[in-house]
C-alpha cells in the first residue's frame, strides 16, 4: 500500500506546482498542471510497453533516458494519442512552451496527457494554459 505524504506533490523541498483551468475540458474543471524543481532532478519514467505509444510518451521517454529533468507539464481532457505526426509536433511544442516560460531547456520537460484518444490537442488553450500555470506556480502547490 502506498503511504500518503502530507503536502502532496510539493512535499519535497524545492518543488513548485500549479493546477489551472485551461478550458480543455468542457466541464470547466482543472485540466492543466505544471510541476517544477528548483534544481536539476534525477528523472526516470515507467511507460507503456504497447507498440502504440501516445505522443507524450514518445517525448517523455527521451527525457527519462537522459535521466535529468526540471519540469513536468500535464493536461487532461485530451490524451494526444493516436494523433500521428501532429500529435508529436504538439507534444514537443508543449515541452518547448513550458521550457520557454520557465527559462529551461525543452529536453528537461516531461509531457503527460490524459483524456479522449484520437483527438489533437487544442494548442491555443494549451499555450495559454502553460502561461497561466507557470504564473501560478507555488511551493504549496
Task: Give, region by region, the residue ranges found by the protein language model.
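Alpha/propeptide regions of enzymes that mature by internal proteolysis
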Residues: 1-141
Amino acid at each position: 500500500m502506498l503511504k500518503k505524504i502530507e503536502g502532496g506533490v510539493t512535499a519535497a523541498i524545492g518543488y513548485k506546482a500549479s493546477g489551472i483551468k485551461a478550458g480543455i475540458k468542457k466541464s470547466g474543471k482543472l485540466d492543466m498542471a505544471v510541476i517544477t524543481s528548483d534544481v536539476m532532478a534525477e528523472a526516470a519514467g515507467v511507460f507503456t510497453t504497447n507498440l502504440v505509444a501516445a505522443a507524450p510518451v514518445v517525448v517523455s521517454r527521451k527525457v527519462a533516458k537522459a535521466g535529468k529533468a526540471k519540469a513536468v507539464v500535464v493536461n487532461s481532457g485530451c490524451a494526444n494519442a493516436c494523433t500521428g505526426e501532429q500529435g508529436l509536433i504538439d507534444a514537443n511544442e508543449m515541452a518547448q512552451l513550458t521550457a520557454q516560460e520557465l527559462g529551461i531547456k525543452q529536453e528537461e520537460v516531461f509531457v503527460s496527457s490524459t483524456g479522449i484518444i484520437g483527438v489533437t490537442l487544442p494548442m491555443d488553450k494549451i499555450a495559454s494554459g502553460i502561461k497561466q500555470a507557470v504564473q501560478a506556480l507555488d511551493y504549496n502547490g
